[in-house]
Each structure stands twice: as structure tokens, then as C-alpha cells.
């Protein structure tokens, strides 16, 4: 367990609690497909980085109630380990193509987190464009269109948001808090479950 990983039991309790109180968890794609009045009882559930543990742990928990989520993946890391993450204390695998296809077929949205999980604030304009455009093209061709993006490390500014807006309708940051679609759609906040 680390500061961005939710323990399995905590996640299970959260999902059970939401269900018992008439709330549902869903992907951003599913949420946007609903009439606005129906959205009040739904929460968009997101996972960054696309670790394989989602397949073995989160999928069964959410599937129990027919819930789904959006998982943000880096396209060059699909099926590989997390050597890129020197802050992670253990070696973890990213979801592979078969696992991502299963999630997609179960109603999960597969969305972009860039190509390599680079800090966008440190990239040149050409590198930034590549990360945003290439990941969009790959995700859309493999799993169908996605309008969502999550900034690696939450790293963004007005210029990065403008670049992302050329390809996506919504972008998630790592800022804590609730949000609405009438807010800044390229700086959507989220709550961590802990």
C-alpha cells in the first residue's frame, strides 16, 4: 500500500457502501451517455496507470453490482512492468492487451494517460504533441473512441490543457475534490479512496 494505491478491502467496503446507499460507480463514457437527471446517483470511478491488479481485484468487485470504471493507460506500457516508477516500492505489471480487451467488453472505458508516463511539464512541444496524439490514436483504434485523458503525475498548465483540448473533451488532474461538468473540463478533480 502506498499513497496512491487503495487497499482491496477498503475499495470493496466503499463499493458495497455506495451500492447499499443507492449509488453506482461507472466509467466517464457511461456517465456522459446518461440523461443529466440520472447522473445524480452515479459516481465516475477512475484508475490511473492501468496496473494488472485492477483485473484481478477491482473488476470482480465492481462487476458484482454491474459497475464499471475508466482506466487511464500509457500505451507503451501495456503488458510491461513499472520500471519507470522509481517511487513504487514493488515491481508491478501493467494490464496486457487481453485484460484490457476484457475490461472494455465488460463496459469499462480504456482512456489515455499518454504514451510513456512522462511529466508533461518537462517535455518539448513536439514531445507533448506526440504523447497526446499518439496515445489517443492507439487507444481509439484498439478500444473505441475515448474523450478522456488523465495527466501523468497530474502535471499540467494552461498550455498543456490547450494541447489536450485538441484531442479530448475532458481531462482529469490529481487535485482532490469533487467536480462538475460545468467546471473546468480540463482540470477535473477526483477523490482518492483511502
Task: Enumerate the predicted regions with their spans.
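Metal-dependent polysaccharide deacetylase catalytic core of the NodB/CE4 family, i.e.
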Residues: 1-2, 40-43, 63-157, 181-189
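N-terminal pre-catalytic segment of deacetylase/amide-hydrolase enzymes
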Residues: 1-43
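A short, Lys/Arg-enriched amphipathic alpha-helix followed by its capping loop at the start of a domain
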Residues: 13-21, 61-66, 106
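Conserved beta-strand segments of alpha/beta enzyme cores
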Residues: 24, 109, 169-170
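Noncatalytic alpha-helical scaffolds and linker/capping helices
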Residues: 48-50
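Glycine-rich anion/phosphate-binding loops
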Residues: 52-54
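A short acidic, amphipathic alpha-helical/loop segment
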Residues: 57-61, 159-163
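Acidic, His- and aromatic-enriched active-site or binding-groove loops in soluble protein domains
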Residues: 92-93, 168-177
